Amino acid sequence: MEFGLSWVFLVAILKGVQCEVQLVESGGVVVQPGGSLRLSCAASGFTFDDYAMHWVRQAPGKGLEWVSLISWDGGSTYYADSVKGRFTISRDNSKNSLYLQMNSLRAEDTALYYCAKD
């Protein structure tokens, strides 16, 4: 069965390592338009709750686009206009984990998603 990009989303998962800092993203699957998806990012090698965290993405053939930011304590969140009202960023400092809940997915959300520390 073949799927076109206009019908499904494929969010590829990459593992990023820089020095001792490790950020491992997971949760990418094929999702129907209008569907939902939750991405996770497990952090290690630094004091997670000392840093604000970001999600960024890269659509095929495009540059990096900032998606969302959450403060160190989760008290403040910020979103790109393109995802506002559809995406929710959260974190669990006890688990050194960052999350991105993505609802009402659109074709233009098709991208590689990365977590990043401030």
Swiss-Prot record:
Span list, region Framework-3: 78-115
Record keywords, A-Z: Adaptive immunity, Cell membrane, Disulfide bond, Immunity, Immunoglobulin, Immunoglobulin domain, Membrane, Secreted, Signal
Region (Complementarity-determining-1): 45-52
Coiled coil feature spans: none
Segments of this protein annotated with the region Complementarity-determining-3: 116-118
GO CC annotation terms, alphabetical: extracellular region; immunoglobulin complex; plasma membrane
Any one biological process term the GO annotation gives: immunoglobulin mediated immune response
CDD domains reported in the protein's UniProt record: IgV_H (cd04981)
Disulfide-linked positions: C41-C115
Pfam families in the cross-refs: V-set
Region (Complementarity-determining-2): 70-77
Spans annotated as Framework-2: 53-69
Role: V region of the variable domain of immunoglobulin heavy chains that participates in the antigen recognition. Immunoglobulins, also known as antibodies, are membrane-bound or secreted glycoproteins produced by B lymphocytes. In the recognition phase of humoral immunity, the membrane-bound immunoglobulins serve as receptors which, upon binding of a specific antigen, trigger the clonal expansion and differentiation of B lymphocytes into immunoglobulins-secreting plasma cells.
Quaternary context: Immunoglobulins are composed of two identical heavy chains and two identical light chains; disulfide-linked.
Protein name, per record: Immunoglobulin heavy variable 3-43D
Organism: Homo sapiens (Human)
